[in-house]
From Swiss-Prot:
It comes from Bison bonasus (European bison). This is Pregnancy-associated glycoprotein 67A. It comes from the Eukaryota. Keywords: Aspartyl protease, Glycoprotein, Hydrolase, Protease, Secreted. Its EC number is 3.4.23.-. Chorionic epithelium (trophectoderm) and placental cotyledons.
């Protein structure tokens, strides 16, 4: 998603949980 700018870890976790 677009949470990489504010929360890189959140974005990475989101990729694993949601799958992009």
């Amino acid at each position: 998603r677009g949470s990489n700018l504010t929360h890189p870890l959140r974005n990475i976790g989101d990729l694993f949980y949601v799958g992009n």
